[in-house]
Amino acid sequence: MQVSVENTSALERRMSITVPAERIESQVNKRLQQTAQKAKIPGFRPGKVPMSVIRQRYEADARQEAVGDVIQASFYEAVVEQKLNPAGAPSVEPKVLEKGKDLEYVATFEVFPEFTVAGFENIAVERLSADVADADLDNMLEILRKQNVRFEVADRAAQNDDQLNIDFVGKVDGEVFAGGSAKGTQLVLGSGRMIPGFEEGLVGAKAGEERVLNLTFPENYQNLDLANKAAEFTVTVNSVSEPKLPELTEEFFAQFGIKEAGLEGFRAEVRKNMERELRQAIKSKVKNQVMDGLLASNPIEVPKALLDNEVNRLRVQAVQQFGGNIKPDQLPAELFEEQAKRRVVLGLIVAEVVKQFDLKPDEDRVRELIQEMASAYQEPEQVVSWYYKNEQQLNEVRSVVLEEQVVDTVLQKASVTDKSVSYEEAVKPVEAPQAD
């Protein structure tokens, strides 16, 4: 077999391959012999059909199959011989397919970029530390109470945080617009559910009152047909209900699966959950900084095949998340290209760090992570057992741990500054990073 390789770009390779005709004919004859053993042709006993008849009937199909198999096998033999690492399936262009002649074809494909991860010392990381103070715990208890608020009808004017039951009709240019009217809608004043001015315009209203609100849709309103348009809303208030926060009782604690523990037991459980959330938030922020630093220090070209695969995967995820009748390939690729590129580049960089430093998942850390995740459930032992009985789930945890070990490896070489902050600042969500 003869092989020659041309570098047509940084990552694209054009490989010309010539396979001896004898190899093709050997595969064709093998298939014809197999066919002869089972072919049923009128006038002949099974297995006794002359090869000339078999060739006449089946050689074309046998040759097509043989050529396909030989191309596939010879391609992978060639990339191994040339020490190439394809990043996707090749595009194959046959050149010579004539019977009795050597098979010649050209395979065009991309390879994975070859690089060494560098620039660790240029990565700056701010590592936060924080504690769950009693005031943080008190705030969380108040949040939990508000999340379980009940509303009772009140015979008074509406205030912020009250829940109103309303009917409304919205018009633009004197015409009711699609989605602009509803009956029996529950609206909490101050929730920000409606456009600016709507909820504010109902403060002070009483049950049975009708108000007309003249408002303007925001410029960035999701419905572009309504963006920046003046609108008139006629609103009828059916009822006004005031919020009633639940007391910190055993009944309230039971809603969170905590029974017969009392207030102190409930506080201890909430604190434990907050501390777990705090650890995860700090770890996530450190990881994001490390990944951003690796990206900035290691610009690499991305194989288009990998980028396309990741875009398609994100399309499928989006359809699964948001539903609807849309098909994944109907979503514009441009929506996902930045995120896809970031993921692909980071995947390549992380894999190279693992290779450079010969990292393997630390099984002790794997068990610790599983136990920490399991602690959020009522039967943690069962959760731990479930992970160790499911190899796929266990391998996913191993991948997470291996990525954590990559972060630790980078931190040993990066410029790290420790900073003490409040619990609130430490758990504040990080803005989604943008691809470079």
From Swiss-Prot:
Gene name per UniProt: tig
EC annotation from Swiss-Prot or TrEMBL: 5.2.1.8
GO molecular function, one term: ribosome binding
Record family assignment: Belongs to the FKBP-type PPIase family. Tig subfamily.
Domain statement: Consists of 3 domains; the N-terminus binds the ribosome, the middle domain has PPIase activity, while the C-terminus has intrinsic chaperone activity on its own.
Catalytic activity: [protein]-peptidylproline (omega=180) = [protein]-peptidylproline (omega=0)
Function field: Involved in protein export. Acts as a chaperone by maintaining the newly synthesized protein in an open conformation. Functions as a peptidyl-prolyl cis-trans isomerase.
Subcellular locations according to the entry: Cytoplasm
Species for this entry: Pseudomonas fluorescens (strain ATCC BAA-477 / NRRL B-23932 / Pf-5)
InterPro entries associated with the record: PPIase_dom_sf (IPR046357), PPIase_FKBP_dom (IPR001179), Trig_fac (IPR005215), Trigger_fac_C (IPR008880), Trigger_fac_C_sf (IPR037041), Trigger_fac_ribosome-bd_bac (IPR008881), Trigger_fac_ribosome-bd_sf (IPR036611), Trigger_fact/SurA_dom_sf (IPR027304)
Main enzyme class: isomerase
GO terms (BP aspect): 'de novo' cotranslational protein folding; cell division; chaperone-mediated protein folding; protein transport; protein unfolding
PPIase FKBP-type domain residues: 161-246
Protein name, UniProt field: Trigger factor
Primary localisation category: cytoplasm
Keywords: Cell cycle, Cell division, Chaperone, Cytoplasm, Isomerase, Rotamase
GO cellular component, one term: cytoplasm
Domain of life: Bacteria
